[in-house]
């Protein structure tokens, strides 16, 4: 009986430690996948890269990271659903960003940028986030 009572705190500690590790590991994998896709897309010479997209990064400074990811996913979704361009890569980015955001949002279309500039800025943000992960 004494052995069981001594094991309980150890098991709880292991459970907490592994859940933190798994959470951080998922963050790494998702960000790596996003960055890899962004590297692939931004290296392409494709006319789709000149399409205009809502500039969600021109949002106010008090916008949360989750809101930014949600708006970026929404803007990408608009591109690949309305244009037959880079659908496989953009839908994958949409899925990964939506997973990081875990919310729904709307996008203000008043400011625009090219898809290339949008993806370059998103890549910079993701690399900064990855360096902190």
Curated annotation (Swiss-Prot):
GO terms for molecular function: cytokine activity; growth factor activity; interleukin-4 receptor binding. It holds the Pfam family IL4. Residues 1-24 form the signal peptide. SUPFAM superfamilies: 4-helical cytokines (SSF47266). GO terms for cellular component: extracellular space. One of its GO terms (biological process) is immune response. Glycans are attached at residues 62, 96, 102, 108. Belongs to the IL-4/IL-13 family. This is Interleukin-4. Participates in at least several B-cell activation processes as well as of other cell types. It is a costimulator of DNA-synthesis. It induces the expression of class II MHC molecules on resting B-cells. It enhances both secretion and cell surface expression of IgE and IgG1. It also regulates the expression of the low affinity Fc receptor for IgE (CD23) on both lymphocytes and monocytes. Positively regulates IL31RA expression in macrophages. Stimulates autophagy in dendritic cells by interfering with mTORC1 signaling and through the induction of RUFY4. Its main location: secreted. Keywords: B-cell activation, Cytokine, Disulfide bond, Glycoprotein, Growth factor, Secreted, Signal. It is found in: Secreted. Disulfide bonds join 27-133, 48-85, 70-105. PROSITE patterns: INTERLEUKIN_4_13. It comes from the Eukaryota.
């Amino acid at each position: 009986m004494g052995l069981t009572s001594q094991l309980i705190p150890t098991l709880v500690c292991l459970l907490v430690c592994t859940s933190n590790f798994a959470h951080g590991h998922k963050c790494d994998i998702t960000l790596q996948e996003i960055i890899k896709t962004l590297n692939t897309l931004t290296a392409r010479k494709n006319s789709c890269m000149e399409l205009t997209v809502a500039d969600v990064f021109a949002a106010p400074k008090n916008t949360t990271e989750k809101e930014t990811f949600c708006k970026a996913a929404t803007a990408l979704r608009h591109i690949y659903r309305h244009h037959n361009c880079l659908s496989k890569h953009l839908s994958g980015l949409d899925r990964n960003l939506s997973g990081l955001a875990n919310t729904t949002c709307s996008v203000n279309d008043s400011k625009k940028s090219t898809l290339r500039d949008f993806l370059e800025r998103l890549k910079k943000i993701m690399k900064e986030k990855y360096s902190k992960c």
